[in-house]
Amino acid sequence: MLKVGLPLGACARSWKSVRMASCGMARRNPLDNKVALVTASTDGIGFAIARRLAQDGAHVVVSSRKQQNVDRAVATLKGEGLSVTGTVCHVGKAEDRERLVATAVKLHGGVDILISNAAVSPFFGSLMDVPEEVWDKILDVNVKATALLTKAVVPEMAKRGGGSIVIVSSIAAYSPFPSLGPYNVSKTALLGLTKNLALELAESNVRVNCLAPGLIRTSFSRVLWEDPARQESIKATFQIKRIGKPEECAGIVSFLCSEDASYITGETVVVAGGSLSHL
């Protein structure tokens, strides 16, 4: 008797394809042709986010305060076959924010995604010893610039029918890091900014969410993990007893920018190994 059909291996592959399509797994590029701006994206968490967004199909504009850092990041990501350009941007300067948005519009026709990641933390010590100019600098860059860059980018998102914004806060918003008082306060402020922006921008179909990373191994957080005793003290508060990796933040951000998160706004996702995350 002649038996007609697919070989067993082919049947298995066909069935796997059906299952992947049924649950949305067949969509290889969830951010296909989206245009994304990522601030402070030449190193650490920002760089990992830029890479992941580009891997997921977005055209990404990376930025940093130094041209050599921008050039290095762009060269690295282009070397991986990703669609990436870059420009210098100090988010505390209005002209730099304007140039960042203009670069995306000129090269790609608009903006769909903003990742607000830039932050400074120039002080380590008692909150009672913080000079006024340090307060001004931290709040200017970490909070005010985030709001003003959002203001600059929303009209471009509206032209394209909406968009997604992810603000990068920190677990320090919930559980303050010792001796980093002004930074902790600024990151708590971003939780409130996220809620307010989400409320106001919903009518423009712009979603606003927040990422709160825990202790992630980056140059920015080195002061917290380079000393073994301090590192062990901090890790003792984690349920997952290790320092996180930038890539463990990037996937969450890509999800929040995708259609899979189309009914999520005003929320903060904590990526912190089980650290306490309640105000």
Swiss-Prot record:
Question: Which SUPFAM superfamilies did the record assign?
Answer: NAD(P)-binding Rossmann-fold domains (SSF51735)
Q: Which InterPro entries match?
A: NAD(P)-bd_dom_sf, Sc_DH/Rdtase_CS, SDR_fam
**EC?**
1.1.1.184, 1.1.1.300
Q: What is its main location?
A: other
List localization entries: Peroxisome
Gene Ontology cellular-component terms listed? mitochondrion; peroxisome
Phosphoserine modifications at? S221
In terms of PROSITE patterns, this protein maps to:
ADH_SHORT
What reaction gets catalysed by this protein? a secondary alcohol + NADP(+) = a ketone + NADPH + H(+); 3alpha-hydroxy-5beta-pregnan-20-one + NADP(+) = 5beta-pregnan-3,20-dione + NADPH + H(+); 5beta-dihydrotestosterone + NADPH + H(+) = 5beta-androstane-3alpha,17beta-diol + NADP(+); all-trans-retinol + NADP(+) = all-trans-retinal + NADPH + H(+)
State the active site: Y183
The record's subunit annotation is: Homotetramer.
Its job: NADPH-dependent oxidoreductase which catalyzes the reduction of a variety of compounds bearing carbonyl groups including ketosteroids, alpha-dicarbonyl compounds, aldehydes, aromatic ketones and quinones. Reduces all-trans-retinal and 9-cis retinal. Reduces 3-ketosteroids and benzil into 3alpha-hydroxysteroids and S-benzoin, respectively, in contrast to the stereoselectivity of primates DHRS4s which produce 3beta-hydroxysteroids and R-benzoin. In the reverse reaction, catalyzes the NADP-dependent oxidation of 3alpha-hydroxysteroids and alcohol, but with much lower efficiency.
Q: What is the recorded name of this protein?
A: Dehydrogenase/reductase SDR family member 4
- Source organism of this protein record: Bos taurus
Q: Which gene encodes it?
A: DHRS4
